[in-house]
Design a protein with these regions (language model features):
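Cysteine-centered catalytic environments shared across enzyme families
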Residues: 1-212
């Protein structure tokens, strides 16, 4: 099963229509979204021109994202989106969980595995303290990350200070189709990696933009 929880700092649409987790009008997607989409009004206008406007429940950028995902698909919508965000998106139809981080990583997103032995739980959150609060969290400090911190005074992505917990890198999309892997990989995953039912890819790359 999949569980999404959200504690919202309301910026756009303070009404109950902006509450999260939020389901798309067609029921395919459920989202927990931290951040802001600066061009969401332009995206709404584009959806209107395409005849793909649902019955809007409010005026939140979250609802705009969901409408885009239903009409254009996940990666095509992300390519149109200007903003800062960390997204957890559950595709009900395809039984796929997507985790997304904005182009420059303005909003953090952590993921990893909690528990011991077989049957570890895959978890994710905007902050490490959210993961530390989970029942069964006993992940030790990662020695490699500690060494990096002592050298650079920061833990570079994709590692976090905890073993088995990683930072989703900027511009990346992590997808899990079906059951999640039940144990952390031996080494941090890099973009283009496939690990059992998990795939990690870049939906945006500065190098690609410069080359274009």
């Amino acid at each position: 099963g999949v569980a999404l929880g959200f504690r919202r700092l309301s910026i756009i649409d303070l009404s109950p229509a902006g509450h999260q987790p939020m389901a798309s009008s067609g029921g395919r997607f459920i989202i927990a979204f931290n951040g802001e989409v600066y061009n969401h009004l332009e995206l709404r206008a584009e959806l209107l021109a395409a005849g793909a406007v649902p019955v809007w429940r409010g005026h939140s950028d979250t609802e705009t994202l969901l409408a885009g995902f239903e009409h254009w698909g996940v990666e095509a919508t992300l390519a149109k989106t200007v903003g800062m965000f960390a997204i957890a998106l559950w595709d009900v139809r395809d039984r796929t969980l997507h985790l997304v981080r904005d182009r420059f990583g303005e909003k953090p997103l952590y993921y990893g595995w909690v528990g011991r032995g077989a049957g570890q739980a895959f978890v994710f959150g905007s902050e490490l303290k959210a993961l530390r609060a989970l029942e069964g969290f006993a992940n030790p400090v990662c020695r490699e990350a500690l060494a990096q911190y002592m050298r650079f005074m920061v833990v570079p992505a994709p590692r976090s200070i905890y073993q088995g917990i990683y930072k989703l890198e900027p511009g990346c999309l992590l997808s899990i189709k079906g059951a999640s892997p039940q144990a952390a990989p031996a080494q941090p995953l890099r973009p283009s990696a496939v690990y059992e039912s998990l795939t990690l890819s870049r939906w945006w790359s500065l190098a690609d933009v410069v080359q274009a």
